[in-house]
UniProtKB/Swiss-Prot annotation:
Residues 165-352 are annotated as: Imidazoleglycerol-phosphate dehydratase. This is Histidine biosynthesis bifunctional protein HisB. InterPro entries: HAD-like_sf (IPR036412), HAD-SF_hydro_IIIA (IPR006549), HAD_sf (IPR023214), His_synth_bifunc_HisB (IPR020566), HisB_N (IPR005954), Histidinol-phos (IPR006543), IGPD_sf (IPR038494), ImidazoleglycerolP_deHydtase (IPR000807). It is found in: Cytoplasm. It comes from Campylobacter jejuni subsp. jejuni serotype O:2 (strain ATCC 700819 / NCTC 11168). The gene is hisB. Disulfide bonds: none annotated.
Amino acid sequence: MSQKILFIDRDGTLIEEPKSDFQIDTLEKLRFEKDAIPTLLKLKKFGFKFVMVSNQDGLGTPSFPKENFEIAHEKMLDILKSCGIEFQDIFICPHFENENCACRKPKTAMLEEYIKHELYDKEQSFVIGDRESDMILASNLGVRGLKYGELSWKEIENEILSSFRSASYQRTTKETDIKVKVCLNGGKVSIKTGIDFFDHMLEQIAVHGGIGLEISCKGDLEIDEHHSVEDVALALGACIKKALGDKIGIARYGFALPMDECLASCAMDFCNRPHLVYKAKFKKSHLGALSTEMIEHFFYSLSYAMGVSLHLKVKGKNDHHKAEGLFKAFAKALKMAVKIESENLASSKGVI
């Protein structure tokens, strides 16, 4: 099974590399790079596995005795383990560059099993290192390379997470042409459906759900808003589902009860058994150019495209506030449900 793997260089990336002799052979030389450990802990929560790939020139020779190397190396691993970080595999090439061995980075012989058995997901794996050889290794593996030094560890974290749990989706029919981009970790918000009140409601999902959301819709509004609202819901739901990927680690369940002068509630389960229970009554037929009956249809289409069981209800006097309350409650429940809480799938069945 393909995994999300970070192939990580050691010296100069994970730990500081001394410029005097480029060897970490004493405990005094062992220093972690700034934010390396917090970043790896964060990425671990998102299901990434770690593989160390390091060139250690002349390891085991009189100029670099193996026992000296192991003192600092084992201490480094002990510290990382105490913080909750372990490497799935550790590959070390001990040769000098002029020996022209098959295992030295950027060659891939050390990672032959990963390549042969397709053990890493090329779309969601990365090489992190401080040298050009690390970037060439990334190219040889068919994954993206992130160069430490040009990027800090926090910037590396942002780069990885912005590409992870993100998705784009386009839905084109005879009635509508819709483009949606979702980043569950936050990002840009830009919504243009041609229906101002609908835009305002969709913005509530982005703002209160803490997600990046870009939607553009060209629809047959000269007829009415039905096709645009329905197809935006279908495209948005499909895009959120795509961004969640394998759903490993997510809380799965969400519940929200925001209160203004109206009371709105939402309960959500990413169970892949779509269902909607909706209880809301509006006095007005329209809010702006949005038909109030289309609010229920929006959530119906959205729940089926997302694959969620969704319970929504609202009580209050002001129709605008009631509609906004429903979208806010949905957003808050979504934020809770997609939050990474563990490294496991929230299902005894092993699939959701």
